[in-house]
Amino acid sequence: MSRKESRKDKHRDETETIADWLKEHRVGEVECVVPDMAGIPRGKILPTTKFLSGLRQGTLRLPESIFGQMVTGVDAETEMLTYQAPDLIMAPVASTIRIVPWYKDPTAQVICDCVNFDGTPSEVAPREILKRVLKLYEERGWKPVVAPELEFYLAAKNLDPDYPLQPPAGKTGRPQTGRQAYGIDAVNEFDPLFEDVYDFCEAQDIGIDSLIHEEGVAQVEMNFNHGDPLAIADQTFLFKRTVRQAALRHDIYATFMAKPYEAEPGSAMHIHQSVVDAVTGENLFATRSGKDTKLFLAHIAGLQKHLPAAMPLIAPFVNSYRRLVRFLSAPINTHWGHENRTVGLRVPISDAKNRRIENRVPGADANPYLAIAASLACGYLGMVQELAPTKAMEGNAYESSRYQLPRHILDATAKFRASSDLKELFGEKFVALYSDVKSSEHDAYQQVISPWERQHLLLNV
């Protein structure tokens, strides 16, 4: 059987699986969602009959230009996409179809891959970029495992973007006025909201476990169960939308912006990652006696060497770099260490089976597909290049001036654009297009006059 025939058979099987599911759940509308470069859900909402007709005839389409959009929704300046570029076909992934739990009428959502008319995957779709990295691991007989920890803030509704955010009022009717790290009652202030979050996640098979109050005012963290990176990225993508929708039901905002409050810590998406043997499931990061392996150390070394160039994928906006400052629970370099929360790469104490690395650099604002792809790609490069890490940091990494991360999106984008290793892994078209999007976003940001400038420059200079 040819590859083309195999793709047709798979498409036919997935189509009938989806059709049966929609009939069983009596779905009236379907949301076809595609994560763009920023992780924003884009796509189409269709009546079920129209959706199935389009699925069978291959007429569910989106312009490739959605991947050239900035977070503002405006097209970036780029030569990677032309005005005559054909549409991409949306290919719904049957395993991701779910009922949207916050709608009154039965409505489904399904994550879609984007493929060319010849059936080949898009070169620039973020979900395909992650699949590309996972294929490299598969070819080596390795299987990565990840578990994100995702932080976010709750905020009172704010209709004026020039006005600073304020913490929301909870059950007591009073906003939080101080930090309550790990505070049980502080979390319970928003019990009705989190009950909705858990219910919505359960309805969508989003595997979250613990909930804690983080260091910031009205800042919380929810952790995901560990699992397959693509499935976890799908869940994280849906989770961010779910939390925002749950918060709106309670008349407040939930934000995954990296640094929404000036005087508070930023929000991260720490990624715990390990690699197991694809056949035996044995953790390749530790021997059975618990000793670190060469592959484990090489994975760390790859993160140390290549993360600075991959920064636009894990710290994608100007605001992202406001989070990466000293003494506010965020890293500023790629030092690594055991149980050291001042480093970028922390190794938690564990037995051999659970040996892993916690990448503390990614922000909550990152596209989960691209953040996980970047983190795994850097570790992969270390493994295949047989790199050796620095000595583990035993002191305060904030006091070190070595192995610094880029301090600004322009610097990070320049490193990303110039990295031959990342171009080979992700593809030249993706690296160029993503870099153009980041550069255009910065140009748009530079057009805005900030309140700080008006306050301090208007009458003083």
Please provide the spans of the model-predicted regions.
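Active-site neighborhood of thiol-dependent amide/isopeptide-bond enzymes
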Residues: 226-238, 261-262
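Accessory "access/gating" subregions that flank catalytic or transport cores
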Residues: 181, 186-190, 194-208, 222-229, ...
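Core alpha/beta catalytic barrel or barrel-like domain that forms the active/cofactor pocket
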Residues: 145-153, 169-184, 204-223, 254-270, ...
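ATP/Mg2+-dependent ligation/transfer catalytic cores
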Residues: 1-208, 232, 401-461
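Short beta-strand elements
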Residues: 163-172, 269-277, 334-336, 343-349
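Short glycine/proline-enriched loop/turn "hinge" motifs that connect secondary-structure elements
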Residues: 99-106, 144, 211-215, 264, ...
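Short, hydrophobic beta-strand segments
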Residues: 110-116, 220-226, 273, 359
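Catalytic-core signal marking the mid-to-C-terminal active-site face
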Residues: 2-5, 18, 238, 245-246, ...
